[in-house]
Amino acid sequence: MKIVEVKHPLVKHKLGLMREQDISTKRFRELASEVGSLLTYEATADLETEKVTIEGWNGPVEIDQIKGKKITVVPILRAGLGMMDGVLENVPSARISVVGMYRNEETLEPVPYFQKLVSNIDERMALIVDPMLATGGSVIATIDLLKKAGCSSIKVLVLVAAPEGIAALEKAHPDVELYTASIDQGLNEHGYIIPGLGDAGDKIFGTK
């Protein structure tokens, strides 16, 4: 499995600010979107382009345009919505596929409760967005849904990832690609990432 920990100074700086305990909802939300945008920049670096001739201000001009598979952004509800706008800044024409998952706090297993995928997802590259890759359960279950629907080109974008989640994802779906702003220390006894970001969903939506 391709694993990319983005080490760009802007990514590290912005993620560091997100770890502050008393960060405001507004600031956390802004930074989640900004880091999501930067991760998208990295995740789409291998997109193919083709030459196209357009009419410029002084006559015909040859330009590069992206070709190949179109993109669907797949936020995992609810926290994934916090990264979606940042992703769309780079790929504004992408279609949105939504998957709802929550984690059973006793078993730590993902529980699906909603899905609405674009009709031609088998023709698109999927960018799954979720702030945290902890145990990996929610992301793995989402990939299961996408593959069942015919999607074969999948990349996962997360703000922070635990080694345990990475290992589980690689075992279940070695053909996907993972892009993260940080590979953190690991999980505590409750399945939360250390040092992590706390509850990203609560911080994005201002709930507790």
UniProtKB/Swiss-Prot annotation:
<feature type="binding site">
    <location>
        <position position="193"/>
    </location>
    <ligand>
        <name>uracil</name>
    </ligand>
</feature>
<feature type="binding site">
    <location>
        <position position="78"/>
    </location>
    <ligand>
        <name>5-phospho-alpha-D-ribose 1-diphosphate</name>
    </ligand>
</feature>
<feature type="binding site">
    <location>
        <begin position="198"/>
        <end position="200"/>
    </location>
    <ligand>
        <name>uracil</name>
    </ligand>
</feature>
<keyword id="KW-0547">Nucleotide-binding</keyword>
<comment type="similarity">
    <text>Belongs to the UPRTase family.</text>
</comment>
<keyword id="KW-0021">Allosteric enzyme</keyword>
<dbReference type="GO" id="GO:0005737">
    <property type="term" value="C:cytoplasm"/>
</dbReference>
<protein>
    <recommendedName>
        <fullName>Uracil phosphoribosyltransferase</fullName>
        <ecNumber>2.4.2.9</ecNumber>
    </recommendedName>
</protein>
<feature type="binding site">
    <location>
        <position position="199"/>
    </location>
    <ligand>
        <name>5-phospho-alpha-D-ribose 1-diphosphate</name>
    </ligand>
</feature>
<dbReference type="GO" id="GO:0016020">
    <property type="term" value="C:membrane"/>
</dbReference>
<dbReference type="GO" id="GO:0042802">
    <property type="term" value="F:identical protein binding"/>
</dbReference>
<dbReference type="GO" id="GO:0006223">
    <property type="term" value="P:uracil salvage"/>
</dbReference>
<keyword id="KW-0328">Glycosyltransferase</keyword>
<comment type="subunit">
    <text>Homodimer or homotrimer in the absence of substrates, and homopentamer or homohexamer in the presence of substrates.</text>
</comment>
<dbReference type="GO" id="GO:0005525">
    <property type="term" value="F:GTP binding"/>
</dbReference>
<dbReference type="GO" id="GO:0004845">
    <property type="term" value="F:uracil phosphoribosyltransferase activity"/>
</dbReference>
<dbReference type="GO" id="GO:0044206">
    <property type="term" value="P:UMP salvage"/>
</dbReference>
<dbReference type="InterPro" id="IPR034332">
    <property type="entry name" value="Upp_B"/>
</dbReference>
<dbReference type="InterPro" id="IPR005765">
    <property type="entry name" value="Ura_phspho_trans"/>
</dbReference>
<dbReference type="GO" id="GO:0006206">
    <property type="term" value="P:pyrimidine nucleobase metabolic process"/>
</dbReference>
<comment type="pathway">
    <text>Pyrimidine metabolism; UMP biosynthesis via salvage pathway; UMP from uracil: step 1/1.</text>
</comment>
<dbReference type="InterPro" id="IPR029057">
    <property type="entry name" value="PRTase-like"/>
</dbReference>
<dbReference type="GO" id="GO:0005829">
    <property type="term" value="C:cytosol"/>
</dbReference>
<comment type="function">
    <text>Catalyzes the conversion of uracil and 5-phospho-alpha-D-ribose 1-diphosphate (PRPP) to UMP and diphosphate.</text>
</comment>
<feature type="binding site">
    <location>
        <begin position="130"/>
        <end position="138"/>
    </location>
    <ligand>
        <name>5-phospho-alpha-D-ribose 1-diphosphate</name>
    </ligand>
</feature>
<dbReference type="InterPro" id="IPR000836">
    <property type="entry name" value="PRibTrfase_dom"/>
</dbReference>
<feature type="binding site">
    <location>
        <position position="103"/>
    </location>
    <ligand>
        <name>5-phospho-alpha-D-ribose 1-diphosphate</name>
    </ligand>
</feature>
<keyword id="KW-0342">GTP-binding</keyword>
<keyword id="KW-0460">Magnesium</keyword>
<keyword id="KW-0808">Transferase</keyword>
<dbReference type="GO" id="GO:0097216">
    <property type="term" value="F:guanosine tetraphosphate binding"/>
</dbReference>
<dbReference type="InterPro" id="IPR050054">
    <property type="entry name" value="UPRTase/APRTase"/>
</dbReference>
<dbReference type="Pfam" id="PF14681">
    <property type="entry name" value="UPRTase"/>
</dbReference>
<dbReference type="GO" id="GO:0000287">
    <property type="term" value="F:magnesium ion binding"/>
</dbReference>
